[in-house]
Design a protein with these regions (language model features):
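An amphipathic alpha-helix adjacent to DNA-recognition modules
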Residues: 8-19, 23, 28-32, 37-40, ...
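Short, solvent-exposed positions on alpha-helices
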Residues: 59, 108, 130, 152-153
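Residue-level recognition of alpha-helical structural elements
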Residues: 3, 76-80, 103, 124-128, ...
Length: 153
């Protein structure tokens, strides 16, 4: 195994360990030592790859998004309705993960991703920034309510 493969293996082990531990307890109650013990890697390996536990979750979300996008290529006539449909289809595909985030009170990680992707940018004029923030927060609220109602539609 070369260094890239080893690093990928370690990150995978750490991510899987954190996800297993999240099934048992809150994120705030999980220590780095528990993660590394469960992952069977050293603390040095943890800190070589991550700053904190939040980074693991954010990176996992980006990984799943990239994987989903790779498997669901966009067409040129991709409309706003298509984008919304894609968001919900992605969440359904990774439903267990997002239910785990919701159950552990850390669903806000999804909001961070939505705001990064669809929210206002610093170069936007004020009105455009306000409108974009309104829409992005509305989409997050819609998804959150959809989860609360059992993801029925």
């Amino acid at each position: 195994m070369d260094n890239t493969e080893k690093n990928s293996y370690v990150k995978n082990q750490i991510t899987n360990a954190l996800l297993r531990l999240l099934k048992e307890k809150e994120l705030k109650d999980i220590s780095i030592s528990e993660i590394t013990t469960t992952a069977q890697v050293s603390r040095i390996s943890f800190y070589r790859n991550y700053n904190d536990k939040d980074t693991i979750i954010k990176e996992y979300i980006h990984l799943t998004l990239n994987e989903w996008n790779k498997n669901h290529p966009k067409t040129e006539e991709h409309t706003e309705d298509d984008i919304l449909g894609d968001i919900f289809a992605y969440i359904i595909e990774y439903k267990d993960f997002y239910l785990l985030l919701r159950d552990r009170g850390i669903f806000y990680f999804l909001k961070d991703i939505i705001m990064d992707a669809l929210g206002p940018k610093s170069e936007y004029p004020n009105f455009d920034a306000y409108t974009t923030a309104f829409i992005a927060n509305g989409i997050y609220g819609w998804i959150e309510e959809w989860f609360l109602r059992g993801m029925q539609e």
